[in-house]
Amino acid sequence: MIPEFKRPELEDKELIDYYFAQAPSRSCERTFANVYLWSRQYKVKYAILHNALVFRDEGDGHTYAYPVGKPEAVKAALEELMKICEDEDCEFGLYCVTPENFSQMEEWYPGQFRIEYDRDQADYIYETEKLATLAGKKLHGKRNHINKFKQLYPDWSYESLSDENVEACFQMALKWRNSNGCNDDPEKNAEMCVSLNSLRLYKELGFKGGVLRNGEKIVAFTVGEELCKDTFVVHIEKAFADVQGAYPMINQQFVEHECMDYTYVNREDDAGEEGLRKDKLSYRPVFLEEKGFVTRIGGQQ
């Protein structure tokens, strides 16, 4: 029997958090907020299957994310998903599969599956201390950007996201959207909708945020949350391009003020954008969190 998949709602947060806590991961997709916000833009639904959390992408041929839960529950869920695909006469496929996930599959089903990693989806993981201090020769250029910002904008200030400034951040985000052609680009528009909803629901989603000002004017903000016990994930970062150094400044200040209780910071993937990839690599990630797509060897079975 095919389980009933539903779109995640705010009232599902406790349930989904419960399953994510059973299988901690440094993959940026493994938070309720990420699932909830992006399900508004894409056809992703969830179900509980054999006591494992399963997401299904209904816009991409009914593929499934690697199940979340304890190992025995994950294996039972995988068996059921394979049977569902067989009954529906469709190819079995899993997305968002980490090397650790695939290693477990190889143990259960040796030689039956292949994985193809997508470099565009790999998350950049950094040492928190290095992002905060920017110490060392390799990050000298980043320190220069910070110093330049301080010289150009001596009235700058940093503050945590709060009820007192969230509406001003929302208005800044609207200006950013209008000046960056988001209305004419479906991908940019979807990402902007996620940004706006992140601000609107920052308390309900358990977000921390940071705000950068030049005088009274907000020139940058960022939003993120705990991913697992040793890793914080930054979901959103917006700055005005004409404010020189605003991006590196909000990055550094946010980590220094909000993330020092964590060993690592996940700054998500680069989506294959060359400029974004160059920038993320320039901060010297300690490793990349790889994710891939799994299919059966030999196709449908």
Predicted segments with their positions:
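Short, conserved active-site entrance elements at the starts or edges of catalytic domains
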Residues: 164-217
